[in-house]
């Protein structure tokens, strides 16, 4: 059994502890240990190989308490019973802080902090003659004789009475700003030793396993305590998490922090984010995602005065159809985001359609996209599209892997049907006014494309090619410019035929070859108007041009010309060639037969035979 000498903190005049020789000489293998409690300080002389358990036995007899109530702390670390003082680096002159736990049971760490640090954050050595120094010094520094630790009272009633306002935010903030607490919290080894000594902390960690992560990282622990100092943030987090904890809980009508500074933010953004939070936490459903469309209004730079939660974007009533223009498209979703296949009802066709136009104007929840249309263009067939959800899709959940496939199919279907609808409308318009089709075909008349054109006329035009051609010619200014060019060339051939030899190469390259004998009665530029358009007048000797007639016949599907004699079949082309100065009847006929009635190719062939 080691020899332990306990003396009071009173120091003799020689400033050496009692029981120690005046000369200060200590026998080898014996060390002096300063034992500090919140209310007293003692110096013990023990052997350096003394175990912590043996030292606790002597301290328990000295303080008249049970050994289980003693907690020894040195250099910020708890001393375990199986350790020795030398193993823990305790040498002569070191300080060991003693914590005596209450007999009524273990108190929580927070309660101990409140009782101790709120009233006496940094206890100092009560001995005015001794080596007094504060407890709040750097932990882990072996050069100093005083180490930092947490000081708890043997009995809470001996030191202070519990302050009824200790739990206030101000008191908690002062406690956390104390240097003792900050240094103690930065010591992760000490924090790991707290749960075994406090059953209430063990219960807390068992019920909430995520709390154990706080004890592994001092930075996270400090951030958590910093967050705990701001009760407003904690209340806001609780409000946000309240719908997640209770799915049946009604949405919190209170706005989020900071939304009151945004115009109408309490109405639009508050409920929008509330709905989005509920949708993400309670499961993503189709009808939930399409329920609130406030983002559409934000994209259109409009702030809704009132945000409601209607059913799936109901279409406007039937009586409102008359107020909508023929090109307006009503769609139930904004930008086609994660939607299931829907059925669309068309006025002119029964085909399904999915339209995804750009948002031009948004009014309320109806989501009407108005497509402006020039006044000069004739109105096409009305294409109102109303998307109505299937009854079976209202309560279905979107699979994760199928949304991209649905979106791709919808875009492809939308492109095909929009193209087919425009093509059908333009074809109907051209059938009503066949002279427009004849003028359009003048664009595709270069001699080097004649063979390609004959191959194309043998089979119907591709839908995409015809759509591009019709869309390009749908502009009234384009059609008017083409007609003016043709009219000017015809006037040039009539008024100044001497210039034709110089411009004929350019006319051939552009596909224009106008007989010089053609005379148009109307010399005023035309205005493209489908309702009042009158076919231009031309003598019977030159009806339009050979190119136009050549290409109108395959398109019209009339096969009777193949049974006629070449003289009858190419009679009009022959007249045009004669009017241009080619008087050899047989040569003209052979050239037309060889070129299958192509007037431009026949002229080129005749000029080559004449050496031009």
Curated annotation (Swiss-Prot):
GO CC list: cytosol
A Pfam family it matches: ubiquitin
InterPro entries: UBA-like_sf, Ubiquilin, Ubiquitin-like_dom, Ubiquitin-like_domsf
Ranges of residues in domain UBA: 564-609
Domain Ubiquitin-like per the UniProt entry, residue ranges: 31-105
Alphabetized GO MF terms: polyubiquitin modification-dependent protein binding
Domain of life, per lineage: Eukaryota
Region (Disordered): 1-25
GO annotation, biological process: ubiquitin-dependent protein catabolic process
Cross-referenced CDD domains: UBA_PLICs (cd14399), Ubl_PLICs (cd01808)
Stated name of the protein: Ubiquilin-like protein
């Amino acid at each position: 059994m080691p020899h332990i000498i306990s003396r009071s903190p009173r120091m003799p005049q020689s400033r050496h502890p009692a029981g120690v020789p005046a000369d200060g000489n200590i026998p080898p293998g014996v060390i002096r240990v300063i034992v500090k409690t919140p209310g007293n300080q003692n110096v013990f002389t023990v052997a350096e190989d003394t175990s912590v358990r043996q030292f606790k036995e002597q301290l328990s007899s000295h303080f008249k308490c049970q050994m289980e109530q003693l907690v020894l702390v040195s250099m910020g670390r708890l001393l375990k019973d199986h350790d020795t003082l030398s193993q823990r680096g305790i040498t002569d002159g070191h300080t060991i802080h003693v914590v005596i736990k209450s007999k009524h049971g273990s108190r929580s760490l927070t309660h101990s902090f409140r009782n101790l640090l709120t009233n006496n954050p940094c206890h100092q050595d009560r001995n005015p003659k001794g080596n007094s120094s504060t407890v709040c010094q750097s932990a882990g520094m072996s050069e100093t004789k005083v180490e930092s630790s947490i000081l708890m009272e043997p009995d809470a009633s001996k030191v202070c009475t519990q302050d009824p306002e200790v739990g206030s935010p101000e008191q908690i903030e002062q406690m956390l700003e104390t240097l003792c607490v900050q240094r103690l919290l930065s010591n992760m080894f000490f924090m790991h030793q707290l749960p075994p000594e406090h059953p209430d902390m063990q219960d807390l960690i068992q019920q909430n396993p995520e709390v154990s992560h706080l004890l592994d990282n001092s930075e996270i622990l400090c951030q958590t305590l910093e967050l705990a100092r701001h009760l407003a943030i904690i209340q806001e987090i609780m409000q946000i998490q309240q719908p997640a904890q209770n799915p049946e809980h009604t949405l919190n009508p209170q706005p989020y922090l900071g939304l009151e500074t945004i115009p109408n933010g309490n109405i639009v953004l508050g409920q929008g984010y509330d709905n989005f939070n509920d949708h993400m936490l309670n499961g993503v459903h189709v009808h939930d995602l399409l329920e609130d469309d406030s983002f559409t209004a934000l994209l259109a730079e409009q702030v809704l005065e009132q945000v409601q939660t209607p059913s799936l974007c109901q279409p406007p009533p039937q009586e409102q159809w008359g107020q909508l223009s023929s090109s307006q498209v009503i769609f139930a979703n904004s930008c086609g985001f994660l939607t299931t296949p829907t059925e669309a009802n068309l006025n002119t066709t029964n085909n399904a359609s999915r339209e995804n136009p750009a948002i031009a104007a948004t009014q309320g929840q109806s989501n009407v996209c108005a497509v402006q249309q020039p006044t000069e263009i004739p109105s096409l067939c009305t294409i109102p599209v109303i998307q109505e959800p299937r009854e079976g899709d209202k309560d279905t959940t979107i699979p994760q892997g199928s949304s991209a496939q649905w979106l791709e199919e919808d875009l492809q279907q939308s492109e095909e049907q929009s193209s087919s609808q425009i093509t059908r409308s333009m074809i109907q318009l051209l059938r009503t006014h066949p002279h427009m089709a004849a003028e359009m075909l003048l664009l595709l008349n270069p001699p080097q494309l004649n063979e390609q054109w004959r191959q194309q006329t043998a089979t119907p035009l591709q839908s995409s090619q015809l759509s591009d051609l019709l869309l390009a010619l749908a502009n009234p200014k384009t059609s008017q410019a083409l007609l003016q060019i043709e009219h000017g060339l015809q006037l040039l051939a009539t008024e100044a035929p001497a210039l034709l030899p110089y411009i004929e190469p350019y006319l051939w390259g552009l596909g224009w070859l106008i007989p010089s004998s053609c005379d148009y009665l109307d010399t005023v530029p035309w205005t493209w108007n489908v309702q009042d358009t009158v076919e231009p007048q031309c003598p019977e000797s030159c009806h339009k041009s050979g190119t136009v007639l050549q290409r109108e016949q395959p398109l019209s599907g009339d096969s009777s010309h193949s049974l006629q004699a070449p003289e009858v079949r190419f009679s009009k082309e022959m007249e045009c060639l004669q009017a241009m100065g080619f008087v050899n009847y047989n040569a003209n006929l052979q050239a037309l037969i060889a070129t299958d009635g192509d007037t431009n190719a026949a002229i080129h062939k005749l000029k080559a035979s004449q050496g031009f």
